[in-house]
Amino acid sequence: MAKNKAEKEKVHKVFQNISTNYDKLNNIISFEQHKVWRKRVMKSMQVKKGSKALDVCCGTADWTIALSKAVGPSGEVIGLDFSENMLKVGEEKTKNMSNIQLVQGDAMDLPFDDNEFDYVTIGFGLRNIPDYVIALKEMNRVLKPGGMAVCLETSQPTIPVFKQGYQLYFKFVMPIFGKLFAKSKEEYEWLQQSAFNFPDRDELKALFQLAGFKNVEVKSFTGGVAAMHLGYKEKETAKGD
């Protein structure tokens, strides 16, 4: 518990400090591929109009906005993040979108009732949570039976040429971007290590299953640099079945 608390405080500090440059940093680090990946994930999700969605670790609300457009005026989207400064950036971007609500909260202790959402997403945020399984179990808890959870995250490339390039990029190029946009060595080192140490696609699939998700689907993007994991909360069985 003490370790988790220290880790939370460290991550909170990082994102409080990089909030104003986060979007720019994300675009540069991913060569704007994160936008392409998100569009492909949204296509896989086939979000229904009028749905209620939760975007965990919403950051500056990019995925929250995409979900808002997908659910339409009759739907509702809540974006949750633990960084007040990240949410301030998100609030500016979503101020004219009436079906979005942004709230501060902890991904490991979601402030919502059981069985509340049709969709729960987390984009490039799971790697920054001290305990992946606790966060995934919380996502499962707040989903309605049969609801969909989706994670878009960096991954570990399996194709040799991508794997070598990825390792070189993280070792030599990413620190340069970090120094330009982060305010301290600790911040850019965290951004680098959290992505580099994140589970590969098969390991994360196993964690999804451990958290209770069924029919978990996995899609890799750009040679495995990023991956989508999509799973469902088990449907309730009718009494007498």
Swiss-Prot record:
Its recorded reaction(s) are: a 2-demethylmenaquinol + S-adenosyl-L-methionine = a menaquinol + S-adenosyl-L-homocysteine + H(+)
Pathway the protein contributes to: Quinol/quinone metabolism; menaquinone biosynthesis; menaquinol from 1,4-dihydroxy-2-naphthoate: step 2/2
Looking at its record, which EC class is this enzyme? transferase
Q: Which domain of life is it from?
A: Bacteria
**What Pfam families does its record include?**
Ubie_methyltran
Q: Which UniProt keywords apply?
A: Menaquinone biosynthesis, Methyltransferase, S-adenosyl-L-methionine, Transferase
Q: Name one GO molecular function term.
A: demethylmenaquinone methyltransferase activity
**E.C. number, please?**
2.1.1.163
TM segment ranges: none
On whether Iron is a keyword of this UniProt record, the answer is no
In its UniProt record, which GO terms are filed under biological process? menaquinone biosynthetic process; methylation
Q: Does the keyword Isomerase apply?
A: no
Task: List ligand-binding residues for S-adenosyl-L-methionine.
Answer: T60, D81, D106, A107
Q: Which family does it belong to?
A: Belongs to the class I-like SAM-binding methyltransferase superfamily. MenG/UbiE family.
Q: What does this protein do?
A: Methyltransferase required for the conversion of demethylmenaquinol (DMKH2) to menaquinol (MKH2).
Protein name, per record: Demethylmenaquinone methyltransferase
Q: Which gene encodes it?
A: menG
